[in-house]
Amino acid sequence: MDVVVNDEWHGRFNLSFKARPGNEEALACFDNALLERLGLDSSKFYPQAQQQLSAAQACIPIDGALDDASSRLDFANQRLYLSVPQIAVKRSARETVDPSQWDSGITAGFLDYNLNTYSTQHRSQGNFRQTYLGLGAGLNIGPWRLRHDGSLNWSDQGQQRYQSIASYAQRDITPWRSQLTLGESYTSGGLFDSLSYTGIRLASDDRMLPASLRGYAPVVRGIASSNARVLIRQRGVTLHETTVAPGAFEIDDLYATGYGGDLEVTVTEADGREHSFSVPYAAVPLSLRAGASRYSATLGTLRNQQLNSNPVFVEGTWQYGLNNLVSTYSGMTLASGYGSALLGGSLNTELGAFGADLTQARTHLPGLGSQQGQSLRLSYAKTLSETDTQIALATYRYSTRGFYGLEDAQLSRQFLRDAGDQRYQRHRSRTTLSLAQPLALNYGQLHLSASASSYWDHAGSDLSYSIGYSNHYKTLGYTLSSTRERDRFGRAGNTLYLSLSLPLGSERVRSLSSSISRDSNGNSRAQATLTGATSDDQHLSYGITASQDRHHGQNNHTLSSNLLYRGSAAELSGSLSQGRHTSQASLGLRGAIVAHADGLTLSQPLSETFGLIHAKDADGARVTSGTALKVDSSGYAVVPNLTPYRRNTVAIDPKGLSTDVELQSSSQQTVPRAGAIPLLVFQTRSGRSAVIHARQVDGQPLPFGAAVLDTNGNELGAVGQGSQLFARGLQDEGEIIVRWDNGSTGNCRITYALPAAAKKTAGAAPQNIQSVCLATPAHP
């Protein structure tokens, strides 16, 4: 059953119950292993309890093990609640889930599909039809997850091609908090460019860490003179609050909050005295918190459709957070005729976060010999507290002429072998900048972004920058922006853009948006879109768009519409558009088929990790952990989105259930591994239901609240107002017992016979019958 410690769910366990001497009530008992899994420190228990635990096969109740410790059993929901003083709870990072609770799921397979067909009619160019089918197949066997992704395109012109995107087997390596991948996949692209490969890869997975230990956040250290309250804020927002004991304290489980803003720490002592200090907080993408590390190791062949052969390569990376200020990282790549090494680090200071790394590469090119080069990358991030200016990310990268990345090197080698020249275009430098400036008094926000790229063997550079302003007036949101772009050939253009958005009431989630844009060549576009849903659960949503384009002096008016239906088994979409010269129609179907031990279950599109619900006879019940999800006629439903290594709550709303079916519990929690398919079994009690109007033989009403039991003593319900009772789980005919005052003063028996059962219908009213409750001897 589920075990909840101090209002925090810790997992599902097999528990033993033992009766206490002189007490009929049995209590759950715990051994050292179970206490450890629950995060409880038995060294804080009473000496007598510690001595009992030291015995072989010891099992003691938590009640009485130390002051204020208690347990409460919720038998109906199969849940045990423990209340334990904080002194006996081991400290762990927030949202920590013991790996023993990670669920590998069941053996099952699935096929996820995305089918789209487009039809275009053009007055001068005729008709054209194209169809796309995307497939994602998987099979889970024990800890292994087998996956394949591919796509098929075909058209009425006879073009047809299936493309395999990735095929691999993957599993967790729990002690290393890592993933092992075998087959066709991709590298992460953290330090080096992302590569498609066929081979083997072992890499750490940050998702296995508690959410409070992911990403970068500084460790906050200080000293308290008493039992003190510590409040940590960032830009006026409270991030964390806790109580610490006298002496030095350390808080190392702050959630990462993006690119920063210094932390304001206030320590309030027991006598009301306060003292404050600040901790610098800014981060570039490769920053790690103190003591954290990441690594990857890949061995395989490079996959690139432009290459005639697939060279073998090996790549390794390592990152480590030395302390609050410094993170370091390094990496290497080796292949035939190629080698590179990278070394870098990041520094967090009061002036912001700085990152720098240098990559040295050596490439052998046919006819040109050995080429050596370097690539320097610089990055910076900072939030200026005085003005709240957010320099989200500024990066600069410069590569010398002799520098090649692995894919660049292999393509250049191939071009030189095949054509005798080097036609592959390579970057010389790249610069990006992003700024955001909130304005005081709710006057909106200014934002600026810019990028520039230059290339070897090409004069000129690509340049793009944009400045914009966004705000809202009551419920009307608006954005105004201006963009300028120039390519390396000197072609330039300016675009001015204005957009408005307005929600239209809350009943059906409707909104109206419009936009206008115009460029320096005189081309313009105006567009208005109405979106909404026909119900609050968004089973059916729609959009209608009207637009006018002016291009090279020609006007074109287009009217288009789209419709999306979300069902429990699939999503169906369609669109129509009509312009001056062109009309288009499309139809799409997205969904999945999940194969398991009891058959096939249809589903909405799946994410990497999803769950399978089984609730016998609960067809029609709504699953609240998603949109438009219902239990099917076989008692199964798929929850298409779960978060791996985190506690996920999955709930069923009994509304819509037949009155002849009762859910024993309406929610469960699961902690799935990445790619797992956990099975969530919701126990149900089936049987016919009825409202019985019954009185005692002398005409007196039955006592309000009296228990209604079957002949085996199982509780079926209770007597309500007006001597009516509602009972579920009945047979077509039989007897039920009404008992009050624990049977010491009254019992009576009702004999019933229900009308022939009609077809089970969700929400159908229970049968109404009249009867008399015949007295039976009272229990002593």
Functional labels for PLM-detected ranges:
Residues L111-L115, H148, L180-L182, Y295-L299, ...:
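Membrane-embedded beta-strand positions of outer-membrane beta-barrel proteins
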Residues A88, T117-Q121, P143, L152-D156, ...:
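Transmembrane beta-strands of outer-membrane beta-barrel pores
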